[in-house]
């Protein structure tokens, strides 16, 4: 089958936002107007097309990023609906990695909210062009220009309206297009009857003022346009559109639109903007990767004629077809039934069937082309972030960075029958979600699961019960502490055992130095002259990694440390890999005496919104929880407090805030960084873990 839509007419976009900004409803409306669904499902009724997991429909939030494809004005638009809750940031990150553009949905009453900042920052890291949709213009307190100001103040974004709303709240009745200088007036509830007319007289001055501001902002990114503007020449609609498109694709400018997805207003104009201003796969730089055979960097331009290269960005277990691997094709074409090479794992995989997904229904297709997003059935070894390529043209594409989990729970099966099922269930859930880890406590034999927050683990335990029919008892949440060294030191690890027969001999000198935060463990072999034979060096590294997993103070993993093996000795007969592994672990123990080890705790960026009269209570809460205030701002009758607070102090805070503010206060928290715990707290943690507390 030939390609249905050219690359120029393909858009891969994500829809991202803070929880409750109306993102899923916006996606629903897109599917409605592009003819993918015939009846609109409301998120708050639990009937939305994109939210297809039972927990999503119950909770009214999007947990997994469903991928769907739609058509608008002879373009194919592949949409990924991403979750807005902070516990599911990996879903957002995975999606951004494979998208070409995004629509950021704001609640027009609140403007930029904490999770908007998080997803915006992630999109900036990946260089994703964005348009902004100020949604919920029908809501009480909706203020379009306030929303635009929060983009400047909180995100320092060069964002400007390309539209203005006509009215707000119950009087929101249309939209002014600042590019065409026409008004769209909505005359029915479904937003299908639209009158295009001249701008109402009482809005004309404002429209002229904001068109001028728009031209000025865009001209700063385009020299030719700037010259015309400075010389007082008329800027045509075509020129302005082209300049907005170019500046948006270069991530120098962010167009802002207005609408109400729930009231069916502004969604079609937003779809027009997706087609007009967001990039096609041809507008973005070719994907880069490394050839595993030569270690040389290679590029894969978006073209069907190039060798096949794709990135797997999500694994999902489907109740009907089993394991689904979602992938983005960067170059080449792929037919069902063919073989590909998973270059990340060095394994050959057969593509069984290829499915084009629509929320949770599917259409089988024979071929996928460059720029497409699809799901494959039959891949056994592939996990999130793996590269799939033509066997004759290998390349490893840049993978997806996975954040470390910050919270853990103990789970135990209720019966022997549940025990076997629980192992399988946890393994499948961990395959789908790289931020979900499953470990067994070596000393107690307990199963410990870790993730990005309480809601994240709640949802996974819930899925274990529903999808895999596993009944389990769940312990109280625990903080995932870490350990690190604060001072450079050198230490010797010497292991010798000779008691008849073959002995054991390993001797190493290792220099340990603190590493930058987030860099993890780095090992360097600086042995000269073979004093530690080359074949034993990997055993030294392995010995360090294994013993660092259990720390030196309270059994938490040691992170952000460099280890340099620089001296040692060996025995011709008695030296072995095991002996050098043990010697390395002894060196680590020895180093702990002088390296000033400390315990690190996850610090959360907490954003608390309360009525003015509760501000004093909140400041007290932050101080009592070892937190520090980072900033405050007034918003209407509310105060917004931003603070860094240790995760350990935040359990149960929702109840405290609810009673202090009579249920009117809300808070959001997102992991920010790790920090040394105070000495007194460190001693308590060590005692508790030693079983003394």
UniProtKB/Swiss-Prot annotation:
This is Elongation factor G. InterPro entries: EFG_II, EFG_III, EFG_III/V, EFG_IV, EFG_V, EFG_V-like, EFTu-like_2, G_TR_CS. One of its GO terms (cellular component) is cytoplasm. The keyword Plastid does not apply. The keyword GTP-binding applies. Belongs to the TRAFAC class translation factor GTPase superfamily. Classic translation factor GTPase family. EF-G/EF-2 subfamily. GO terms for molecular function: GTP binding; GTPase activity; translation elongation factor activity. It is found in: Cytoplasm. Gene3D superfamilies: 3.30.230.10, 3.30.70.240, Elongation Factor G (Translational Gtpase), domain 3 (3.30.70.870), P-loop containing nucleotide triphosphate hydrolases (3.40.50.300), Translation factors (2.40.30.10). NCBIfam families: EF-G, PRK12740.1-3, PRK12740.1-5, small_GTP. Catalyzes the GTP-dependent ribosomal translocation step during translation elongation. During this step, the ribosome changes from the pre-translocational (PRE) to the post-translocational (POST) state as the newly formed A-site-bound peptidyl-tRNA and P-site-bound deacylated tRNA move to the P and E sites, respectively. Catalyzes the coordinated movement of the two tRNA molecules, the mRNA and conformational changes in the ribosome. GTP binds at residues 17-24, 81-85, 135-138. It comes from the Bacteria. Residues 8-282 form the tr-type G domain. The lineage of its organism: Bacteria, Bacillati, Bacillota, Bacilli, Lactobacillales. Keywords: Cytoplasm, Elongation factor, GTP-binding, Nucleotide-binding, Protein biosynthesis. PANTHER family: RIBOSOME-RELEASING FACTOR 2, MITOCHONDRIAL, TRANSLATION ELONGATION FACTOR G-RELATED. One of its GO terms (biological process) is ribosome disassembly. PROSITE patterns: G_TR_1, G_TR_2.
């Amino acid at each position: 089958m030939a390609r249905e839509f050219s690359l120029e007419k393909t858009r891969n976009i994500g829809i991202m936002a803070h929880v409750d900004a109306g993102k899923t409803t916006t996606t629903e409306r897109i599917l409605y107007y592009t003819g993918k669904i015939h009846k609109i499902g409301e998120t708050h009724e639990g009937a939305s097309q994109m939210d297809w997991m039972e927990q999503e429909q119950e909770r009214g939030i999007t947990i997994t990023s469903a991928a769907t494809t739609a058509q608008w004005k002879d373009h194919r638009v592949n949409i990924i609906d991403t979750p807005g809750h902070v516990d599911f940031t990996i879903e957002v990150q995975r999606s951004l990695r494979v998208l070409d553009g995004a629509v950021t949905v704001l609640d027009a009453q609140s403007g930029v909210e904490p999770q908007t900042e998080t997803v915006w920052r992630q999109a900036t890291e990946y260089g994703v062009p964005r348009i902004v949709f100020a949604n919920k213009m029908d809501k009480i307190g909706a203020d379009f220009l306030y929303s635009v100001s929060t983009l400047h103040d909180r995100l320092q974004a060069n964002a400007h309206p390309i539209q203005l709303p006509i009215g707000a709240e119950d009087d929101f009745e249309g939209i002014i297009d600042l590019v065409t200088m026409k008004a769209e007036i909505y005359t029915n509830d479904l937003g299908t009857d639209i009158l295009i007319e001249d701008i109402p007289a009482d809005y004309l001055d404002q429209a002229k003022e904001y068109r001028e501001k728009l031209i000025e902002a865009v001209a700063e990114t385009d020299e030719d346009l700037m010259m015309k503007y400075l010389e007082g020449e008329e800027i045509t609609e075509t020129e302005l559109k082209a300049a907005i498109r170019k500046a948006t694709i270069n991530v120098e400018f962010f167009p802002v639109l207005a609408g109400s997805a729930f009231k069916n207003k502004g969604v079609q104009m937003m779809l027009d903007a997706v087609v007009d201003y967001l990039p096609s796969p041809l507008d973005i730089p070719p994907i880069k990767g490394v050839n595993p055979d030569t270690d040389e960097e290679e590029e894969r331009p978006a073209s069907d004629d190039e060798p096949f290269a794709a990135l797997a960005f999500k694994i999902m277990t489907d109740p009907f077809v089993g394991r689904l691997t979602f992938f983005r094709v960067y170059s080449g074409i792929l037919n069902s039934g063919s073989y590909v090479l998973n270059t990340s794992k060095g394994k050959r995989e057969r593509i069984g069937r290829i499915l084009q997904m629509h929320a949770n229904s599917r259409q089988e297709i024979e071929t996928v082309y460059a720029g497409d997003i699809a799901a494959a059935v039959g891949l056994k070894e592939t996990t999130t972030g793996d590269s799939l390529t033509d066997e004759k043209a290998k390349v490893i594409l840049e993978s997806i960075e996975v954040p470390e989990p910050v919270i853990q729970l103990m789970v135990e099966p209720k019966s022997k029958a549940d025990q076997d099922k629980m192992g399988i269930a946890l393994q499948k859930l961990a395959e789908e979600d790289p931020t979900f880890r499953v470990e067994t406590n070596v000393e107690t034999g307990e199963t410990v699961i870790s993730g990005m927050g309480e809601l994240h683990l709640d949802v996974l335990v819930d899925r274990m019960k529903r999808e895999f029919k596993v009944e389990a008892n769940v312990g109280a949440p625990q903080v995932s502490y870490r350990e690190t060294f604060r001072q450079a030191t050198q230490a010797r690890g010497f292991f010798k055992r000779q008691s008849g027969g073959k002995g054991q001999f390993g001797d190493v000198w290792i220099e340990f130095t603190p590493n930058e935060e987030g860099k993890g463990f780095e090992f360097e072999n600086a042995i000269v002259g073979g004093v530690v034979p080359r074949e034993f060096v990997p055993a030294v590294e392995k010995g360090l990694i294994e013993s660092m997993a259990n720390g030196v103070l309270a059994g938490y993993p040691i992170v952000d440390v460099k280890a340099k093996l620089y001296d040692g000795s060996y025995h011709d007969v008695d030296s072995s890999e095991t002996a050098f592994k043990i010697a390395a672990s002894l060196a680590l123990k020895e180093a702990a005496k002088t390296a000033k080890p400390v315990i690190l705790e996850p610090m959360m960026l907490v954003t608390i919104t309360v009525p003015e009269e509760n501000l004093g209570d909140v400041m007290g809460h932050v101080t009592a929880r070892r937190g520090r205030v980072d900033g405050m701002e007034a918003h209407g009758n509310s105060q917004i407090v931003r603070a860094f607070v240790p995760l350990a102090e935040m359990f149960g805070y929702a109840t405290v805030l609810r009673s202090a503010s009579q249920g009117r206060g809300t808070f959001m928290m997102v992991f920010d960084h790790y920090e040394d715990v105070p000495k007194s707290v460190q001693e308590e943690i060590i005692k508790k873990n030693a079983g003394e507390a």
